């Protein structure tokens, strides 16, 4: 069954768990800007039009100005008030080139090569954030996750205390009772086979993001084994990661290693994890590797009728995010709000 036949039929209730009213109020009180590198895509144009109509978040569209206006006209959306930037005519390009050469000096960056690289809207947009011209960036509508993350890593880097950048996906769907079900999955987009310590960091960042989504994280380190029922190096890796996490963050509820059925089904948990208070009730899932995470989230999205938010990038030193290329205009709009407001104002110092 298809939950929504068209974007217009997606009820606002799907997004209530994210408390967008609070995010919008925050943005009205503390105005922000968001760079959208794929300025000619109809989904980006529609999202920008909605942001402009709401007058709470200023979109910055990257692209040839004539092409952006033509795309807006063809799509039938009003983007008056949007700022459009074209790399080839950007007035501060000389300054941008100088800064980019400084950042990449150890890699032998030359001005000629820098000018060529900065024609790429993702590099250009990321440098706008680095220079402090604008506040946040959302890409991935027409490009891969790597196209967004590579310039972010090269230019922005990780925040203090983080050793890697990871990602999570927020999945939400309405319940018949009128509220929403929300689960968070990590890492689904970046780290191919994280080590034990990397899994601990991924779990911590994913749990903090779950709090941003309005849920109390109950974390499951997923495996094909539940508490030693299976054997193998991947089981050991997840078991050790779960133990390290519990030792480092004893105030955060977690379980592992555990199979998915025992993590979400109270009936199965009663058999496989007797005595566990959170088994069967977890909502934040840490996958052992990228294959499992990416496949798992797409199964949930397409067969479970979940609305997806992300991949949300975790650990960067600036609010930069990406979408998947199959995203809708509605997802661009809502992820723009999340990126500018929620991810730009996170405070989890008690967990760090």
Set out the residue ranges of the language-model regions.
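Anion-binding alpha/beta catalytic cores of soluble intermediary-metabolism enzymes, centered on
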Residues: 17-352
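Short, small-residue-biased leader/transition segments that mark boundaries at the very start
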Residues: 1-3
């Amino acid at each position: 069954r298809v939950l929504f036949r068209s974007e217009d039929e997606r009820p606002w209730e799907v997004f209530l768990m994210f408390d967008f009213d609070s995010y919008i109020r925050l943005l009205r009180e503390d105005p922000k800007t968001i760079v959208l590198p794929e300025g000619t895509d109809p989904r980006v144009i529609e999202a920008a039009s909605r942001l402009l109509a709401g007058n709470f978040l200023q979109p910055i569209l990257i692209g040839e100005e004539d092409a952006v206006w033509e795309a807006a006209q063809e799509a039938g959306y009003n983007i008056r008030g949007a700022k459009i930037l074209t790399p080839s005519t950007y007035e501060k390009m000389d300054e941008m080139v100088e800064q980019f050469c400084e950042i990449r000096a150890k890699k032998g960056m030359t001005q000629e090569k820098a000018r060529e690289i900065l024609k790429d809207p993702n590099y250009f947009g990321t440098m706008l954030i680095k220079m402090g011209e604008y506040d946040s960036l959302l890409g991935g509508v027409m490009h891969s996750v790597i196209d967004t993350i590579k310039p972010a890593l090269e230019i922005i880097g990780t925040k203090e205390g983080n050793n890697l950048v990871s990602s999570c996906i927020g999945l939400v769907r309405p319940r018949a009772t009128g509220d929403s079900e929300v689960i968070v999955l990590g890492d689904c987009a970046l780290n191919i086979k994280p080590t034990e310590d990397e899994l601990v960091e991924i779990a911590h960042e994913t749990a903090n993001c779950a709090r941003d989504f309005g849920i109390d994280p109950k974390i499951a380190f997923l495996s094909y084994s539940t508490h030693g029922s299976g054997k193998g190096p991947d089981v050991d890796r997840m078991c050790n990661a779960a133990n390290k996490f519990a030792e480092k963050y004893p105030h955060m509820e977690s379980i592992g290693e555990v199979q998915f059925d025992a993590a979400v089904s109270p009936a199965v948990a009663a058999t496989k994890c007797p005595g566990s208070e959170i088994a069967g009730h977890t909502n934040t899932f840490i996958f052992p590797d990228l294959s499992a995470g990416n496949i798992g989230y797409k199964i949930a999205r397409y067969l479970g009728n979940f609305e997806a938010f992300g991949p949300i990038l975790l650990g960067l030193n600036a609010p930069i995010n990406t979408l998947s290329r199959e995203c809708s205009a509605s997802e661009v709009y809502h992820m723009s709000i999340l990126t500018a407001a929620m991810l730009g104002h996170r405070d989890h110092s008690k967990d760090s």
